[in-house]
């Protein structure tokens, strides 16, 4: 997974506190569960080696998010269950055009374009036509990834335990209703704007390293 770019609720906002409390509160149900901060992963597999590269990623993400005139809005919906460690229990996020556009830009600028430039013999020395061809291919690749692979969500549990038993599901859903209110999945739960965090996700979850953040 390497380094990932997270979109988080505004720090210490009510939704931040509710999600963080939920993540902590569900840990006893899963013996191998880890604690982590609430977030939506925009993209993974980012390669950064210097503080300058960290700053570039965060500043570029903020610039892209600020292109939304009315502010960047996140909408959460119903709880889902999966088989994968990082998608065991999660809240689905509405894939709005603004969110998908942001994820595509991040994938293109921070993952696919650096890969393409490193594979090119000398990108900067190429003709404008050659660079445009690479740029187009990278853009198409990012658009395809966004369309076919990107699935925005807010994880509540990391675990290898599978399946999630019916009794545990009932407990989880009761706790979610206690925290967010009955019918939370249809009540407009979410947040506006927030924080970008660049996180090195290597090794055990408790060893993940936050490389930098930007509030917007």
From Swiss-Prot:
Residues noted as binding substrate in the record, renumbered to the chain: 41, 155, 158
Protein name: 2',3'-cyclic-nucleotide 3'-phosphodiesterase
Major location (coarse): Golgi
Keywords tagged on the record: Golgi apparatus, Hydrolase
GO MF term list: 2',3'-cyclic-nucleotide 3'-phosphodiesterase activity
One GO term of the biological process aspect: cyclic nucleotide metabolic process
Active site, renumbered: 39, 153
Encoding gene, per UniProt annotation: CPD1
Family as reported in the entry's similarity comment: Belongs to the 2H phosphoesterase superfamily. CPD1 family.
Domain of life: Eukaryota
Primary enzyme class: hydrolase
GO cellular component, one term: Golgi apparatus
Function: Involved in the metabolism of ADP-ribose 1',2'-cyclic phosphate which is produced as a consequence of tRNA splicing.
The organism's taxonomic lineage, starting at the top: Eukaryota, Fungi, Dikarya, Ascomycota, Saccharomycotina
The keyword Chloroplast is annotated on this UniProt entry: no
Origin species: Yarrowia lipolytica (strain CLIB 122 / E 150) (Yeast)
Entry's localization field: Golgi apparatus
SUPFAM superfamilies: LigT-like
E.C. numbers: 3.1.4.37
